[in-house]
Amino acid sequence: TIHGKSAHGMMPQNGINGATYLALFLSQFDFQGNAKTYLDLIAETLHKDFFAEKTGLAYTDPKMGELTMNAGVFSFSKESEDNTIALNIRYPQGVDTDAIKAGLEKLEGPKAVSLSEHGHVPHYVPVNDPMVETLLSVYENQTGLKGHEQIIGGGTFGRLLKRGVAYGAMFPGYVNTMHQANEFTEVEDLYRAAAIYAEAIYELI
């Protein structure tokens, strides 16, 4: 039995991908044809390739950080010629989908590469933007802590606005159970966040 551990798609290095570990185990046996090609690709290239180094897509932006890759959905049948692997790739500014597709097409094994973009192009608002400065000032006033920008690979509603940003609500020492079993937050953190949001709204309007 292989036990995996879930993690947010933007931080695959924090999880344990049971599927790639299974492929790593199975690849030692004498499979042939499509099965061998499929297992070898997963075991030799995708297994623990969180930053797409083995796939040749690795990239780091000075502001937005590293491209991340999570091999998340696998579908294989010995009767099928359409066996698939879905990769969740979070990429910063400086990378585009054409480069990602071209890189994946160079891998040994895949017969075709298709992209589903969901309209999620990289989104960044500079720390010296007046709105961001206001939000950081409110955080500092409410907590007594130094505020700073934080770049994440997760999709947020902030991207719906040209100058939109995600704002909270993870405080220092926060136990991050996001998208995991038994996800929770502390009630006290909810109170602290509500006070910050109230002042932020007041200052922005």
Model feature map: region roles:
Residues 13-24, 66, 95, 99, ...:
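Conserved active-site and cofactor/substrate-binding residues in soluble primary-metabolism enzymes
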Residues 53-55, 133-134, 158:
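Glycine-rich, charge-dense phosphate/pyrophosphate-binding loop(s)
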Residues 79, 136-204:
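Zn-dependent metallopeptidase/amidohydrolase metal-coordination segment
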Residues 2-8, 113-118, 174-181:
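A short small-residue
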